[in-house]
Protein backbone atom coordinates (compact mmCIF):
# COMPACT_ATOMS: atom_id res chain seq x y z
CA UNK A 1 0.00 0.00 0.00
CA UNK A 2 1.34 3.42 -0.96
CA UNK A 3 2.33 5.88 1.75
CA UNK A 4 1.26 9.05 -0.05
CA UNK A 5 2.17 11.35 2.85
CA UNK A 6 5.83 10.31 2.80
CA UNK A 7 5.98 10.30 -0.99
CA UNK A 8 4.65 13.89 -1.07
CA UNK A 9 7.20 15.02 1.53
CA UNK A 10 10.02 13.46 -0.48
CA UNK A 11 8.76 15.24 -3.60
CA UNK A 12 8.90 18.59 -1.77
CA UNK A 13 12.40 17.78 -0.54
CA UNK A 14 13.61 16.93 -4.04
CA UNK A 15 12.21 20.22 -5.31
CA UNK A 16 14.09 22.07 -2.55
CA UNK A 17 17.26 20.12 -3.36
CA UNK A 18 17.01 21.19 -6.99
CA UNK A 19 16.59 24.85 -5.96
CA UNK A 20 19.70 24.64 -3.74
CA UNK A 21 21.82 22.74 -6.27
CA UNK A 22 22.04 19.62 -4.09
CA UNK A 23 22.15 16.20 -5.77
CA UNK A 24 22.14 13.90 -2.72
CA UNK A 25 20.78 14.93 0.69
CA UNK A 26 21.45 13.06 3.93
CA UNK A 27 19.37 13.02 7.12
CA UNK A 28 19.87 11.34 10.47
CA UNK A 29 17.78 11.29 13.59
CA UNK A 30 20.43 13.18 15.51
CA UNK A 31 20.59 16.47 17.36
CA UNK A 32 23.41 19.05 17.48
CA UNK A 33 25.28 16.73 19.89
CA UNK A 34 24.94 13.42 18.00
CA UNK A 35 22.77 12.03 20.80
CA UNK A 36 21.30 8.55 20.39
CA UNK A 37 17.83 9.65 21.49
CA UNK A 38 16.61 13.07 20.46
CA UNK A 39 13.85 15.58 21.06
CA UNK A 40 10.99 15.52 18.55
CA UNK A 41 12.32 18.76 17.00
CA UNK A 42 15.20 16.76 15.50
CA UNK A 43 13.24 13.83 14.04
CA UNK A 44 13.79 14.95 10.46
CA UNK A 45 14.68 11.50 9.14
CA UNK A 46 11.47 10.08 10.62
CA UNK A 47 9.45 12.90 9.04
CA UNK A 48 10.74 12.07 5.56
CA UNK A 49 10.64 8.24 5.62
CA UNK A 50 8.38 7.06 8.48
CA UNK A 51 11.13 4.99 10.16
CA UNK A 52 10.98 5.57 13.93
CA UNK A 53 14.01 3.58 15.12
CA UNK A 54 16.78 5.32 17.06
CA UNK A 55 19.51 4.48 14.54
CA UNK A 56 19.30 5.10 10.83
CA UNK A 57 20.46 7.38 8.01
CA UNK A 58 18.28 8.46 5.10
CA UNK A 59 19.83 9.48 1.78
CA UNK A 60 17.61 11.06 -0.90
CA UNK A 61 18.51 11.67 -4.53
CA UNK A 62 16.70 12.68 -7.72
CA UNK A 63 14.98 9.38 -8.42
CA UNK A 64 15.38 7.36 -5.23
CA UNK A 65 15.96 7.16 -1.49
CA UNK A 66 17.64 4.69 0.86
CA UNK A 67 17.64 4.04 4.60
CA UNK A 68 20.63 2.44 6.33
CA UNK A 69 19.99 0.81 9.72
CA UNK A 70 21.36 -2.02 11.86
CA UNK A 71 20.16 -5.50 12.73
CA UNK A 72 18.03 -4.38 15.68
CA UNK A 73 15.67 -2.64 13.28
CA UNK A 74 15.52 -4.74 10.09
CA UNK A 75 12.03 -6.12 10.76
CA UNK A 76 10.67 -2.79 12.02
CA UNK A 77 12.16 -0.85 9.10
CA UNK A 78 10.64 -3.24 6.54
CA UNK A 79 7.20 -2.54 7.96
CA UNK A 80 7.57 1.23 8.38
CA UNK A 81 9.12 1.82 4.95
CA UNK A 82 6.39 -0.06 3.10
CA UNK A 83 4.86 2.12 0.39
CA UNK A 84 7.26 5.03 0.93
CA UNK A 85 9.53 4.19 -2.08
CA UNK A 86 12.49 4.23 0.36
CA UNK A 87 14.79 1.21 -0.06
CA UNK A 88 16.18 -0.55 3.04
CA UNK A 89 19.95 -1.08 3.20
CA UNK A 90 20.72 -3.66 5.91
CA UNK A 91 23.99 -2.58 7.50
CA UNK A 92 26.79 -5.15 7.94
CA UNK A 93 25.01 -7.70 5.74
CA UNK A 94 26.87 -9.37 2.89
CA UNK A 95 26.68 -7.43 -0.36
CA UNK A 96 25.17 -4.31 1.23
CA UNK A 97 27.24 -1.15 0.59
CA UNK A 98 28.03 1.25 3.42
CA UNK A 99 26.79 4.82 3.00
CA UNK A 100 30.29 5.89 1.99
CA UNK A 101 30.54 3.13 -0.61
CA UNK A 102 27.10 3.95 -1.97
CA UNK A 103 27.90 7.65 -2.34
CA UNK A 104 31.25 6.89 -3.96
CA UNK A 105 29.62 4.51 -6.44
CA UNK A 106 26.58 6.63 -7.28
CA UNK A 107 27.62 10.29 -7.10
CA UNK A 108 29.04 11.80 -10.27
CA UNK A 109 31.99 14.13 -10.81
CA UNK A 110 31.27 17.65 -9.53
CA UNK A 111 27.95 16.86 -7.85
CA UNK A 112 26.93 18.17 -4.40
CA UNK A 113 26.20 16.25 -1.21
CA UNK A 114 24.06 18.18 1.27
CA UNK A 115 23.35 17.79 4.96
CA UNK A 116 22.77 19.94 8.04
CA UNK A 117 26.30 20.12 9.44
CA UNK A 118 24.98 20.73 12.95
CA UNK A 119 23.57 17.19 13.15
CA UNK A 120 26.39 15.33 11.38
CA UNK A 121 29.28 14.22 13.59
CA UNK A 122 32.67 15.57 12.53
CA UNK A 123 33.90 11.97 12.31
CA UNK A 124 31.31 11.18 9.64
CA UNK A 125 31.68 14.49 7.83
CA UNK A 126 35.42 13.88 7.49
CA UNK A 127 34.77 10.39 6.10
CA UNK A 128 32.47 11.82 3.44
CA UNK A 129 35.08 14.45 2.56
CA UNK A 130 37.73 11.80 2.05
CA UNK A 131 35.52 9.48 0.00
CA UNK A 132 34.19 12.21 -2.27
CA UNK A 133 37.22 14.43 -2.83
CA UNK A 134 38.55 12.29 -5.69
CA UNK A 135 35.37 13.10 -7.65
CA UNK A 136 35.57 16.78 -6.65
CA UNK A 137 32.18 16.50 -4.99
CA UNK A 138 31.16 19.57 -3.01
CA UNK A 139 29.71 19.28 0.48
CA UNK A 140 27.00 21.80 1.38
CA UNK A 141 26.52 21.66 5.14
CA UNK A 142 25.05 25.06 5.97
CA UNK A 143 21.34 24.39 5.45
CA UNK A 144 18.56 22.38 7.07
CA UNK A 145 16.30 21.73 4.07
CA UNK A 146 13.52 20.45 6.32
CA UNK A 147 13.04 23.92 7.80
CA UNK A 148 10.75 25.24 5.06
CA UNK A 149 8.98 21.91 4.45
CA UNK A 150 8.17 20.74 8.00
CA UNK A 151 5.71 23.51 8.79
CA UNK A 152 4.32 22.03 12.03
CA UNK A 153 7.72 21.17 13.46
CA UNK A 154 7.81 20.96 17.30
CA UNK A 155 9.48 23.78 19.24
CA UNK A 156 13.19 23.64 20.05
CA UNK A 157 13.55 22.04 23.53
CA UNK A 158 14.24 24.25 26.55
CA UNK A 159 13.15 22.31 29.65
CA UNK A 160 13.93 23.26 33.24
CA UNK A 161 17.44 22.48 34.53
CA UNK A 162 18.01 21.19 38.08
CA UNK A 163 21.06 20.72 40.31
CA UNK A 164 22.10 17.22 41.37
CA UNK A 165 23.11 17.35 45.02
CA UNK A 166 26.73 16.38 45.68
CA UNK A 167 25.51 13.82 48.24
CA UNK A 168 23.82 12.00 45.36
CA UNK A 169 26.50 12.69 42.73
CA UNK A 170 29.34 11.49 44.96
CA UNK A 171 31.83 14.04 43.59
CA UNK A 172 31.92 17.83 43.43
CA UNK A 173 32.14 19.85 40.21
CA UNK A 174 35.63 20.95 41.27
CA UNK A 175 36.81 17.34 41.61
CA UNK A 176 35.39 16.44 38.23
CA UNK A 177 36.91 19.50 36.54
CA UNK A 178 40.31 18.69 38.06
CA UNK A 179 40.17 15.09 36.77
CA UNK A 180 39.02 16.30 33.36
CA UNK A 181 41.82 18.87 33.10
CA UNK A 182 44.42 16.27 34.08
CA UNK A 183 43.30 13.96 31.28
CA UNK A 184 43.04 16.91 28.89
CA UNK A 185 46.66 17.87 29.60
CA UNK A 186 47.83 14.27 29.07
CA UNK A 187 46.31 14.46 25.59
CA UNK A 188 48.37 17.58 24.86
CA UNK A 189 45.44 20.01 24.91
CA UNK A 190 45.02 23.31 26.75
CA UNK A 191 41.27 23.44 26.11
CA UNK A 192 38.34 21.08 25.65
CA UNK A 193 35.18 21.62 23.61
CA UNK A 194 32.62 19.35 25.26
CA UNK A 195 29.48 18.67 23.23
CA UNK A 196 28.12 15.34 24.53
CA UNK A 197 25.03 16.04 26.61
CA UNK A 198 25.30 13.32 29.26
CA UNK A 199 29.00 14.15 29.77
CA UNK A 200 28.05 17.79 30.30
CA UNK A 201 25.36 16.88 32.85
CA UNK A 202 27.80 14.61 34.70
CA UNK A 203 30.60 17.20 34.75
CA UNK A 204 28.51 20.06 36.14
CA UNK A 205 26.23 17.94 38.39
CA UNK A 206 23.10 19.21 36.69
CA UNK A 207 20.20 17.47 34.95
CA UNK A 208 17.68 18.59 32.34
CA UNK A 209 14.61 17.33 30.51
CA UNK A 210 15.16 18.21 26.84
CA UNK A 211 15.09 14.61 25.59
CA UNK A 212 12.35 12.15 26.49
CA UNK A 213 13.57 9.72 29.18
CA UNK A 214 17.08 11.24 29.08
CA UNK A 215 17.65 13.85 31.84
CA UNK A 216 19.85 16.14 29.74
CA UNK A 217 19.77 19.81 28.73
CA UNK A 218 20.88 21.24 25.38
CA UNK A 219 24.33 22.64 26.15
CA UNK A 220 28.02 22.91 25.27
CA UNK A 221 31.08 23.65 27.39
CA UNK A 222 34.49 25.14 26.72
CA UNK A 223 36.99 24.11 29.39
CA UNK A 224 40.48 25.59 29.74
CA UNK A 225 43.16 25.08 32.39
CA UNK A 226 41.67 27.98 34.36
CA UNK A 227 38.05 28.49 33.30
CA UNK A 228 34.81 26.69 32.47
CA UNK A 229 32.17 28.21 30.18
CA UNK A 230 28.74 26.61 29.85
CA UNK A 231 26.57 27.41 26.83
CA UNK A 232 22.96 26.74 27.78
CA UNK A 233 19.55 28.30 27.22
CA UNK A 234 19.31 30.72 30.11
CA UNK A 235 15.51 30.64 30.09
CA UNK A 236 15.89 27.02 31.33
CA UNK A 237 17.78 28.16 34.46
CA UNK A 238 16.02 29.32 37.61
CA UNK A 239 17.67 31.46 40.29
CA UNK A 240 18.90 28.43 42.25
CA UNK A 241 20.72 26.93 39.24
CA UNK A 242 22.15 30.31 38.22
CA UNK A 243 23.50 30.87 41.75
CA UNK A 244 24.89 27.32 41.89
CA UNK A 245 26.82 27.76 38.62
CA UNK A 246 28.15 31.14 39.72
CA UNK A 247 29.25 29.72 43.08
CA UNK A 248 31.34 27.12 41.24
CA UNK A 249 32.90 29.78 38.98
CA UNK A 250 31.20 28.48 35.84
CA UNK A 251 30.60 31.25 33.31
CA UNK A 252 27.23 30.95 31.58
CA UNK A 253 26.60 32.03 27.99
CA UNK A 254 23.56 31.61 25.75
CA UNK A 255 23.37 28.25 23.96
CA UNK A 256 23.24 29.58 20.42
CA UNK A 257 26.31 31.83 20.82
CA UNK A 258 28.78 28.93 20.75
CA UNK A 259 29.78 29.33 17.08
CA UNK A 260 30.47 33.06 17.48
CA UNK A 261 32.43 32.34 20.68
CA UNK A 262 34.63 29.78 18.92
CA UNK A 263 35.19 32.09 15.95
CA UNK A 264 36.39 34.84 18.32
CA UNK A 265 38.95 32.69 20.15
CA UNK A 266 42.59 33.74 19.75
CA UNK A 267 44.28 31.54 17.16
CA UNK A 268 46.58 28.65 18.03
CA UNK A 269 44.87 26.95 20.97
CA UNK A 270 45.29 23.17 21.24
CA UNK A 271 41.62 22.21 21.60
CA UNK A 272 40.56 18.64 22.37
CA UNK A 273 37.49 17.59 20.38
CA UNK A 274 35.73 14.24 20.23
CA UNK A 275 34.74 13.85 16.60
CA UNK A 276 32.03 11.34 17.47
CA UNK A 277 29.98 14.05 19.19
CA UNK A 278 31.37 17.36 17.93
CA UNK A 279 29.28 18.48 14.97
CA UNK A 280 30.80 18.94 11.54
CA UNK A 281 29.80 22.63 11.73
CA UNK A 282 31.71 23.22 14.98
CA UNK A 283 34.67 21.22 13.70
CA UNK A 284 34.90 23.30 10.52
CA UNK A 285 34.61 26.48 12.62
CA UNK A 286 37.58 25.50 14.81
CA UNK A 287 39.63 24.07 11.96
CA UNK A 288 40.21 27.52 10.48
CA UNK A 289 42.29 29.01 13.33
CA UNK A 290 42.92 26.36 16.00
CA UNK A 291 45.08 23.30 16.47
CA UNK A 292 42.67 20.41 16.91
CA UNK A 293 43.58 17.55 19.21
CA UNK A 294 41.27 14.80 18.03
CA UNK A 295 40.59 12.28 20.79
CA UNK A 296 37.97 10.98 23.20
CA UNK A 297 36.13 13.14 25.70
CA UNK A 298 38.04 12.64 28.98
CA UNK A 299 34.69 12.83 30.75
CA UNK A 300 33.37 9.68 29.08
CA UNK A 301 35.60 7.22 30.93
CA UNK A 302 35.42 9.20 34.18
CA UNK A 303 31.62 9.06 34.02
CA UNK A 304 31.55 5.35 33.17
CA UNK A 305 33.43 4.32 36.32
CA UNK A 306 30.81 4.72 39.02
CA UNK A 307 32.05 6.11 42.34
CA UNK A 308 31.23 4.46 45.71
CA UNK A 309 28.28 6.79 46.38
CA UNK A 310 26.78 6.06 42.97
CA UNK A 311 27.25 2.30 43.35
CA UNK A 312 25.66 2.23 46.79
CA UNK A 313 22.61 4.17 45.59
CA UNK A 314 22.39 2.02 42.46
CA UNK A 315 22.18 -1.15 44.57
CA UNK A 316 19.27 0.34 46.52
CA UNK A 317 17.46 1.56 43.42
CA UNK A 318 17.95 -1.64 41.41
CA UNK A 319 16.48 -3.65 44.29
CA UNK A 320 13.39 -1.41 44.42
CA UNK A 321 13.06 -1.56 40.65
CA UNK A 322 13.40 -5.37 40.70
CA UNK A 323 10.59 -5.56 43.26
CA UNK A 324 8.35 -3.47 40.98
CA UNK A 325 9.07 -5.68 37.96
CA UNK A 326 8.52 -8.87 39.98
CA UNK A 327 5.15 -7.58 41.24
CA UNK A 328 4.24 -6.74 37.63
CA UNK A 329 5.06 -10.28 36.46
CA UNK A 330 2.89 -11.76 39.21
CA UNK A 331 0.00 -9.46 38.29
CA UNK A 332 0.32 -10.28 34.60
CA UNK A 333 0.40 -14.04 35.12
CA UNK A 334 -2.62 -13.97 37.44
CA UNK A 335 -4.75 -11.60 35.35
CA UNK A 336 -4.13 -12.54 31.72
CA UNK A 337 -7.22 -14.14 30.20
CA UNK A 338 -9.40 -12.83 33.04
CA UNK A 339 -9.48 -9.21 31.87
CA UNK A 340 -8.47 -7.40 28.71
CA UNK A 341 -4.75 -6.63 28.79
CA UNK A 342 -2.88 -5.26 25.78
CA UNK A 343 0.80 -4.64 25.20
CA UNK A 344 0.15 -0.98 26.03
CA UNK A 345 -1.93 -1.49 29.19
CA UNK A 346 0.62 -4.02 30.46
CA UNK A 347 3.38 -1.41 29.98
CA UNK A 348 1.19 1.18 31.72
CA UNK A 349 0.71 -1.09 34.73
CA UNK A 350 4.45 -1.62 35.03
CA UNK A 351 5.04 2.13 34.82
CA UNK A 352 2.53 2.63 37.63
CA UNK A 353 4.42 0.15 39.84
CA UNK A 354 7.60 2.15 39.22
CA UNK A 355 5.85 5.43 40.00
CA UNK A 356 5.07 4.08 43.46
CA UNK A 357 8.81 4.15 44.23
CA UNK A 358 9.53 7.48 46.02
CA UNK A 359 12.73 8.18 44.06
CA UNK A 360 11.05 7.71 40.65
CA UNK A 361 11.62 10.52 38.13
CA UNK A 362 10.74 9.11 34.70
CA UNK A 363 11.09 6.05 32.51
CA UNK A 364 14.61 5.51 31.18
CA UNK A 365 13.18 4.73 27.72
CA UNK A 366 9.70 4.00 26.34
CA UNK A 367 8.76 0.49 27.46
CA UNK A 368 9.04 -2.21 24.81
CA UNK A 369 6.24 -4.75 25.30
CA UNK A 370 6.04 -7.25 22.44
CA UNK A 371 3.63 -10.18 22.36
CA UNK A 372 4.43 -13.34 20.39
CA UNK A 373 5.84 -12.40 16.95
CA UNK A 374 6.00 -8.68 17.85
CA UNK A 375 8.81 -9.58 20.24
CA UNK A 376 10.98 -10.57 17.26
CA UNK A 377 11.35 -6.82 16.58
CA UNK A 378 14.04 -5.90 19.12
CA UNK A 379 12.91 -2.30 19.54
CA UNK A 380 9.20 -2.70 18.83
CA UNK A 381 6.98 -0.05 20.39
CA UNK A 382 3.25 -0.66 20.66
CA UNK A 383 0.77 2.22 20.46
CA UNK A 384 -2.83 2.41 21.72
CA UNK A 385 -4.02 2.26 18.10
CA UNK A 386 -1.72 -0.58 17.09
CA UNK A 387 -1.11 -3.17 19.78
CA UNK A 388 -1.81 -6.81 20.48
CA UNK A 389 -4.23 -8.12 23.09
CA UNK A 390 -2.62 -10.65 25.42
CA UNK A 391 -4.09 -14.14 25.68
CA UNK A 392 -3.26 -17.01 28.07
CA UNK A 393 -0.79 -18.46 25.55
CA UNK A 394 2.64 -17.62 24.21
CA UNK A 395 5.02 -15.08 25.71
CA UNK A 396 5.32 -11.33 26.28
CA UNK A 397 8.75 -9.69 26.08
CA UNK A 398 9.04 -6.59 28.27
CA UNK A 399 12.16 -4.39 28.10
CA UNK A 400 11.84 -1.45 30.46
CA UNK A 401 13.59 0.82 32.91
CA UNK A 402 13.30 3.82 35.17
CA UNK A 403 15.10 7.02 36.03
CA UNK A 404 15.39 7.44 39.78
CA UNK A 405 17.10 9.84 42.14
CA UNK A 406 19.78 7.24 42.70
CA UNK A 407 20.21 5.41 39.42
CA UNK A 408 19.00 4.41 35.97
CA UNK A 409 17.64 0.89 35.40
CA UNK A 410 17.26 -1.35 32.36
CA UNK A 411 15.76 -4.84 32.61
CA UNK A 412 14.16 -7.32 30.21
CA UNK A 413 12.10 -10.39 30.98
CA UNK A 414 10.20 -12.63 28.57
CA UNK A 415 7.11 -13.83 30.41
CA UNK A 416 5.18 -17.05 29.73
CA UNK A 417 1.43 -16.42 29.58
CA UNK A 418 0.35 -19.95 28.59
CA UNK A 419 1.33 -22.92 26.44
CA UNK A 420 4.54 -22.55 24.40
CA UNK A 421 6.17 -24.86 21.87
CA UNK A 422 9.13 -27.14 22.56
CA UNK A 423 11.25 -25.00 20.21
CA UNK A 424 10.43 -21.83 22.17
CA UNK A 425 11.19 -23.58 25.45
CA UNK A 426 14.58 -24.69 24.14
CA UNK A 427 15.34 -21.18 22.87
CA UNK A 428 14.35 -19.62 26.20
CA UNK A 429 16.42 -22.12 28.18
CA UNK A 430 19.54 -21.40 26.14
CA UNK A 431 19.08 -17.62 26.46
CA UNK A 432 18.90 -18.10 30.24
CA UNK A 433 22.06 -20.23 30.05
CA UNK A 434 23.76 -17.46 28.06
CA UNK A 435 22.92 -14.86 30.71
CA UNK A 436 24.22 -17.08 33.49
CA UNK A 437 27.48 -17.90 31.69
CA UNK A 438 28.31 -14.23 31.22
CA UNK A 439 27.25 -13.40 34.78
CA UNK A 440 29.92 -15.77 36.08
CA UNK A 441 32.75 -14.49 33.90
CA UNK A 442 36.13 -14.43 35.64
CA UNK A 443 38.90 -12.67 33.78
CA UNK A 444 42.24 -10.91 33.97
CA UNK A 445 42.24 -7.12 33.87
CA UNK A 446 42.71 -5.91 30.32
CA UNK A 447 39.66 -7.55 28.73
CA UNK A 448 37.09 -5.57 26.77
CA UNK A 449 33.55 -6.67 26.03
CA UNK A 450 34.77 -8.26 22.81
CA UNK A 451 36.82 -10.75 24.86
CA UNK A 452 33.84 -11.76 27.02
CA UNK A 453 30.96 -11.65 24.51
CA UNK A 454 31.47 -15.29 23.48
CA UNK A 455 30.39 -16.46 26.95
CA UNK A 456 26.87 -15.22 26.23
CA UNK A 457 26.79 -15.94 22.51
CA UNK A 458 28.16 -19.52 22.56
CA UNK A 459 24.97 -21.33 23.75
CA UNK A 460 23.03 -19.55 21.01
CA UNK A 461 25.65 -20.05 18.31
CA UNK A 462 25.63 -23.75 19.25
CA UNK A 463 22.08 -23.81 17.78
CA UNK A 464 23.30 -22.02 14.61
CA UNK A 465 21.39 -18.88 15.65
CA UNK A 466 22.63 -15.33 16.30
CA UNK A 467 20.97 -12.24 17.75
CA UNK A 468 22.53 -9.71 15.35
CA UNK A 469 23.24 -7.04 17.96
CA UNK A 470 25.52 -6.37 20.89
CA UNK A 471 25.26 -8.31 24.14
CA UNK A 472 25.65 -5.33 26.44
CA UNK A 473 26.09 -1.60 26.96
CA UNK A 474 26.95 0.68 29.84
CA UNK A 475 24.15 2.38 31.79
CA UNK A 476 24.22 5.96 33.04
CA UNK A 477 23.67 7.21 36.58
CA UNK A 478 20.49 9.28 36.48
CA UNK A 479 21.50 9.76 32.85
CA UNK A 480 21.20 7.99 29.49
CA UNK A 481 20.29 4.32 29.59
CA UNK A 482 22.91 3.66 26.89
CA UNK A 483 26.37 4.75 27.95
CA UNK A 484 29.93 4.05 26.82
CA UNK A 485 32.75 3.58 26.26
CA UNK A 486 32.28 0.01 27.55
CA UNK A 487 30.17 -2.36 25.49
CA UNK A 488 29.91 -6.03 24.65
CA UNK A 489 29.99 -7.18 21.01
CA UNK A 490 31.53 -10.12 19.21
CA UNK A 491 33.22 -8.29 16.33
CA UNK A 492 34.88 -5.02 15.55
CA UNK A 493 32.93 -2.60 13.36
CA UNK A 494 34.07 0.66 11.82
CA UNK A 495 34.22 3.57 14.25
CA UNK A 496 33.61 1.26 17.21
CA UNK A 497 35.01 2.39 20.55
CA UNK A 498 36.03 -0.20 23.11
CA UNK A 499 37.12 0.09 26.71
CA UNK A 500 38.89 -2.23 29.11
CA UNK A 501 36.61 -3.12 32.01
CA UNK A 502 37.48 -1.08 35.09
CA UNK A 503 36.40 -1.62 38.67
CA UNK A 504 33.01 0.13 39.00
CA UNK A 505 31.92 0.01 35.34
CA UNK A 506 28.39 -1.26 34.76
CA UNK A 507 27.25 -3.27 31.74
CA UNK A 508 24.03 -4.92 30.60
CA UNK A 509 23.87 -8.66 29.95
CA UNK A 510 21.15 -9.20 27.34
CA UNK A 511 21.48 -12.07 24.87
CA UNK A 512 18.39 -13.11 22.96
CA UNK A 513 16.81 -15.07 20.11
CA UNK A 514 14.53 -13.43 17.54
CA UNK A 515 12.62 -15.58 15.05
CA UNK A 516 10.74 -13.39 12.57
CA UNK A 517 7.03 -14.13 12.47
CA UNK A 518 7.18 -16.41 15.51
CA UNK A 519 8.75 -15.17 18.75
CA UNK A 520 11.39 -13.07 20.44
CA UNK A 521 13.21 -13.87 23.68
CA UNK A 522 15.50 -11.60 25.67
CA UNK A 523 16.63 -11.72 29.28
CA UNK A 524 18.54 -8.69 30.55
CA UNK A 525 20.32 -7.91 33.81
CA UNK A 526 22.70 -5.09 34.71
CA UNK A 527 26.04 -6.02 36.26
CA UNK A 528 29.03 -4.13 37.70
CA UNK A 529 32.66 -5.09 37.01
CA UNK A 530 34.58 -5.54 40.26
CA UNK A 531 38.18 -6.28 41.17
CA UNK A 532 38.78 -9.80 42.47
CA UNK A 533 42.01 -11.55 43.50
CA UNK A 534 45.29 -9.85 42.62
CA UNK A 535 48.35 -12.09 42.47
CA UNK A 536 51.52 -12.73 40.48
CA UNK A 537 49.42 -13.25 37.33
CA UNK A 538 47.69 -9.90 37.58
CA UNK A 539 44.35 -8.41 38.64
CA UNK A 540 41.44 -10.81 38.24
CA UNK A 541 37.90 -9.44 37.90
CA UNK A 542 34.28 -10.60 38.08
CA UNK A 543 30.76 -9.23 37.71
CA UNK A 544 28.31 -8.42 40.51
CA UNK A 545 24.63 -8.48 39.56
CA UNK A 546 22.33 -5.52 40.26
CA UNK A 547 19.09 -6.93 38.76
CA UNK A 548 17.08 -9.45 40.79
CA UNK A 549 13.98 -10.47 38.83
CA UNK A 550 12.95 -14.14 38.43
CA UNK A 551 13.70 -16.00 35.22
CA UNK A 552 10.49 -17.69 34.09
CA UNK A 553 10.39 -21.24 35.44
CA UNK A 554 7.66 -22.30 32.99
CA UNK A 555 9.98 -21.71 30.01
CA UNK A 556 12.99 -23.62 31.38
CA UNK A 557 13.66 -27.21 30.35
CA UNK A 558 16.72 -28.33 32.28
CA UNK A 559 17.49 -31.19 29.88
CA UNK A 560 19.14 -28.55 27.67
CA UNK A 561 21.43 -27.32 30.47
CA UNK A 562 24.72 -28.73 31.67
CA UNK A 563 25.39 -29.10 35.39
CA UNK A 564 27.24 -25.78 35.67
CA UNK A 565 24.45 -23.88 33.90
CA UNK A 566 21.86 -25.50 36.19
CA UNK A 567 23.91 -24.53 39.26
CA UNK A 568 24.23 -20.91 38.12
CA UNK A 569 20.51 -20.65 37.36
CA UNK A 570 19.44 -22.18 40.68
CA UNK A 571 21.79 -19.85 42.58
CA UNK A 572 20.36 -16.79 40.81
CA UNK A 573 16.75 -17.82 41.44
CA UNK A 574 17.49 -18.54 45.10
CA UNK A 575 19.06 -15.09 45.52
CA UNK A 576 16.07 -13.47 43.81
CA UNK A 577 13.77 -15.02 46.40
CA UNK A 578 15.99 -13.98 49.30
CA UNK A 579 16.24 -10.37 48.14
CA UNK A 580 12.72 -9.78 46.78
CA UNK A 581 10.37 -11.83 48.99
CA UNK A 582 10.57 -9.49 52.04
CA UNK A 583 8.82 -6.80 49.96
CA UNK A 584 5.94 -8.99 48.70
CA UNK A 585 2.53 -9.85 50.14
CA UNK A 586 1.75 -13.49 51.03
CA UNK A 587 0.22 -14.40 47.65
CA UNK A 588 3.12 -12.86 45.74
CA UNK A 589 5.63 -14.50 48.06
CA UNK A 590 4.06 -17.95 47.59
CA UNK A 591 4.12 -17.50 43.81
CA UNK A 592 7.75 -16.35 43.85
CA UNK A 593 8.76 -19.37 45.93
CA UNK A 594 7.37 -21.66 43.22
CA UNK A 595 8.76 -19.51 40.42
CA UNK A 596 12.27 -19.67 41.86
CA UNK A 597 11.94 -23.29 43.08
CA UNK A 598 12.72 -22.29 46.64
CA UNK A 599 9.91 -24.41 48.11
Predicted regions and their residues:
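Active-site neighborhoods and metal-handling regions in enzymes and metal-associated proteins
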Residues: 1-599
Amino acid sequence: MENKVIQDRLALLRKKMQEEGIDFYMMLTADFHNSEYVNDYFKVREYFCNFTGSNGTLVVWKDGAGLWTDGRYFIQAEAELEGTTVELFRMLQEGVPTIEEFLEQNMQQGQTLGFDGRVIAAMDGKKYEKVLEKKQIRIAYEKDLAESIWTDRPDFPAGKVTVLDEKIAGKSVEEKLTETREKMAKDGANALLLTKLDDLMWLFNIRGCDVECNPVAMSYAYITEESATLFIQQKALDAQVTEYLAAHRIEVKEYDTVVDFLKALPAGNAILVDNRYCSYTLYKTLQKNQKLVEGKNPTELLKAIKNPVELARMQEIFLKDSVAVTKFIYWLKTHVGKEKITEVTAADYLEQKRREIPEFLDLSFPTIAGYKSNAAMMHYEATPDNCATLEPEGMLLVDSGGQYLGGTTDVTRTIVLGPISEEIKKHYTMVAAAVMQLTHAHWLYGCTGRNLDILARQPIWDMDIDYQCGTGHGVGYILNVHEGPQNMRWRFTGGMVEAVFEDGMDITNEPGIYIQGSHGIRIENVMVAKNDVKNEYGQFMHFETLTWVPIDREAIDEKYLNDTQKKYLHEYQKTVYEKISPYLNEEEKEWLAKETRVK
